[in-house]
Amino acid sequence: FYGGFYAFAIAQVLIGIGGSLMSGSDSAIIYDTLLETNNKTSYTKIEGRSYAIGNFSEALAGILGGFLAVGSIYLPIYVQTSILFFSIPIALTLVEPTMHEENKLDRSFSAIMGVVRFAILDNAKLRWLIIYSSAMGVATLSMAWFAQPFFNQVGVPLAYFGILWAGLNFSAGLTSFNAHKFDKKGRNYSMLIYLSLAMFISFILLGFNNSLFGLIFILIIYLLRGIVTPILRNEININTTSNKRATVLSVRSFIIRISFAICAPILGYIAENYSLASSFYILAIIVGLFSLLASFRLSKLD
């Protein structure tokens, strides 16, 4: 209803606040509900399918949004706002797990910092899981950021950008939908090593393939994203208690975003002044170094 940059900026800030309030709570409610019903082994399956639905929705929205924008640039926003409205009555129907009433943390800054200290300093498994998540988060967020410049560089017609974007999100949804099949007790930390190597090699090969063939490696990165996200959330849930769960998951998300915020301008500068391939090589080093280090440390702690 209000055009201009400042209205857009305010809207983005409000969206960020809304996202931060939800951060960690959704996964924590799912896990604690399953814990309460003695069904926690189903978490990866449910989390994976929830994440898959989000990816499928984004894929569909990418296509429909393009068609709506042809009529008016504001039309996708009107439709999106209408859909978001339904989240309010849905949120009101959610039932808090009864275990959340036990051992409640104080709603104070010192209590929050205590959980941050627990996740980053006191609990070694959580620390390395968060470091691993941050490395993978930087990789996947950067790929989402660099996908369109890569499409442009290899000569993909603009008309196909939306279709490719939808296809990539759909592929992440497919692997996320089936992530529970990769989630085997006692094998996860060793499997993280293979996922790290696959991500590292994909970025290296993407840097070498400045052609349409490189789209295959972008696809692989999205497929890996669908697998690793639900499994990592499950591992973090296993290694924390219910009264700290939502905050620990929120700390994980915060560190991922901060890591990306630090890396993104540097990677963008390198892509602009040197080459996109150089950014992919640097990403390969960052992801390979931190994710492999974290996965090796986790395998020793297991």
Cite the ranges covered by each PLM segment:
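Juxtamembrane helix-start motifs in multi-pass secondary transporters
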Residues: 76, 187-194, 279
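Helix-loop junctions at membrane interfaces in 12-TM secondary transporters
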Residues: 1-12, 205-218
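Substrate-agnostic recognition of the 12-TM MFS/MFS-like secondary transporter fold
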Residues: 7-69, 80-87, 92-95, 128-149, ...
